[in-house]
Amino acid sequence: RCIRDSLRQALREVATSGELDSLLRYQPHRGRPQDRASIARHLRRRGITPDADQILIVNGAQHGLAVTVMAALNAGDVVAVDALTYPGFKVLAHAFHLDVEPIPTTADGPDLDAFEQLCATRPVRALYTMPTLHNPLGWVMSATDRTRLIEIARRHGPLIIEDAAYAYLVEDPPPPLAASAPDITVYVSGLSKSVATGLRVGFVVAPTSRVPSLERAIRATTWNTPALTTAIACRWIEDGTVDQLEAQKREDAKARQALARRELAGLPLIGHPSSYFTWVPLPDDARADRLTATLARQHISVSTAEPFTTSKRTPQALRLALGSTDLDSLQSTLRTVRRVAIEDGYA
């Protein structure tokens, strides 16, 4: 059953459920108790077991990150982030005047020696991290590295902000940081990536002591997430639609990643086997901006490293999004990318 059919069915069920009037009223800032209970059950399949009282429903994961920053940090606070990271967090850091400290990355995750050294020399208030399918590099931190990261955080005191937006794409990953360190971790995720981008339903799982300040931030920014969309999302959680859609997307992403590796043979690719994006590092003397401009003239949009970079030096690289078109069009597009790269001497 396609998502349009699922949506039609859910709308009919909501319309005849007898709760439509209540769904159109103001709701508790952190969401209705029954909806938070549904999300708690969903999160158990992600490897964490929060109480419903630890969950706050938000308008997507980006809103979840925003209210976390509002609730936990102040202007000038030092925040550790990967040297290449999600651009949406960079936007928040700039808007809230945070002091961003980049952590070098390895092939498998953040350089934990560098993170520990940073914590020893600067008053790091928070670490923003994507341990399960990093954007843009696609790595999944090992269980050993997760344990060490938590040990460093416990020694030095920073809050861990765990972004799990893409975690659904990884089968059987190590447990989230929030599973091992729920008292020092705020876990942020949502259904926009895994179900539908227009379904702006996200969730924050926080230590109980931080829930009131997060709730105030939700009140200040949106009052509450619309109960109508939350009700649809929770119906899909309960009837298995979310699990089905996530499984379909994992298989689709695997097919797209495999296609990219075939069509871009000769280019160095970095990415998870079930990721919807891949990273193409270029030589230091390359001009990624020139490549993107050439591709743009052929109606192909790719990104340089600049939006993802938090360090002073921007590496020469491209990020290719693989999920925005059908497979036939993607194949043609990838062939064009490879041809342009070859013409410029990069493959």
Regions found by a protein language model. Name each.
Residues 2-6, 11-156, 167-186, 343-345:
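Conserved core of the PLP fold type I
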Residues 7, 179-213, 225-228:
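Active-site PLP attachment segment
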Residues 81, 161-162:
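Hydrophobic residues in beta-strands of the RecA-like P-loop NTPase core, especially within AAA+ ATPase
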Residues 205, 279-281, 321-323:
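Short hydrophobic/aromatic beta-strand micro-patches
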Residues 214-219, 237-261, 285:
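Structural signature of PLP-dependent enzymes
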Residues 250-261, 269-282, 291-294:
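Conserved glycine-rich beta-strand-loop-beta hairpin in the small C-terminal domain of fold type I
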Residues 297, 311-347:
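PLP-dependent enzyme catalytic core of the Aspartate aminotransferase-like
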